[in-house]
Swiss-Prot record:
Name used for this protein in its record: Protein FAM3A
MF (Gene Ontology): carbohydrate binding
UniProt cross-references to InterPro entries, sorted A to Z: FAM3, ILEI/PANDER_dom, ILEI_FAM3C
Higher taxonomy: Eukaryota, Metazoa, Chordata, Craniata, Vertebrata
Signal sequence coordinates: 1-33
């Protein structure tokens, strides 16, 4: 028996109304008071708005450097396992990834005016020849920046001349550097005062972080460009 025309219309209207209510509940339309469908499958933790990540600047510094300053980060090696890093103006000058670091002293020479890398080398201070290091740092030109990061042992092969040259570059700690100490330093040829950029931790069995080695050091900052470099 077929439904009469008016009854058909009533059934159609009711069907449309029910469908609209169901869709509104699932999609959470305006004023529905129901959560949206995707929220039904989302954990409370994931719905929390993530805190904005702190912005990092060149070499990972938390603040930008002033004009006419160079951003840097120097990290010493950790024991004899993790190599050191030297970053300048967001460019990695020395690291294990670049395969240009080694046991001893890792040194990058930089033009203090332009900020361009002049040369980067590692010097073995346990079994190497200290004369190689002396030939590297003796002829530095005025205004050359010197970045140093230790790895494993920075001092066994050091002699008085080596310590004196680093002291003239602005180091306070070169004269007392010893076997397996951790050391990071930034100096320059021609400075009149001691550098503010230096950290040193003595190798001591009472305070070492690693078995046989002190903690790794990390130093960052902004270096003013030199006025002259020849």
């Amino acid at each position: 028996m077929r439904l009469a025309g008016p009854l058909r219309i009533v059934v159609l209207v009711v069907s449309v109304g029910v469908t609209w209510i169901v869709v509104s509940i699932l999609l959470g339309g305006p004023g529905s008071g129901f959560p949206r469908i995707q929220q039904l499958f989302t954990s409370p933790e994931s719905s929390v708005t993530a805190a904005p990540r702190a912005r990092k600047y060149k070499c990972g510094l938390p603040q930008p450097c002033p004009e006419e300053h160079l951003a840097f980060r120097v990290v010493s090696g950790a024991a004899n396992v993790i190599g050191p890093k030297i970053c300048l103006e967001d460019k990695m000058l020395m690291s294990s990834v670049k395969d240009n670091v080694g046991r001893g002293l890792n040194i990058a020479l930089v033009n203090g005016v332009s900020g361009e890398l002049i040369e980067a080398r590692a010097f073995d201070m346990w079994a190497g020849d200290v004369n190689d290091l002396l030939k590297f740092i003796r002829p530095l030109h005025e205004g050359t920046l010197v970045f140093v990061a230790s790895y494993d042992d920075p001092a066994t092969k050091m002699n008085e001349e080596t310590r004196k040259l680093f002291s003239e570059l602005g180091s306070r700690n070169a004269k007392e550097l010893a076997f397996r100490d951790s050391w990071v330093f930034v100096g320059a040829k021609g400075v009149q005062n001691k550098s503010p950029f230096e950290q040193h931790v003595k190798n001591s069995k009472h305070s070492n972080k690693y078995e046989g080695w002190p903690e790794a050091l990390e130093m960052e900052g902004c270096i003013p460009r030199r006025s002259t470099a020849s």
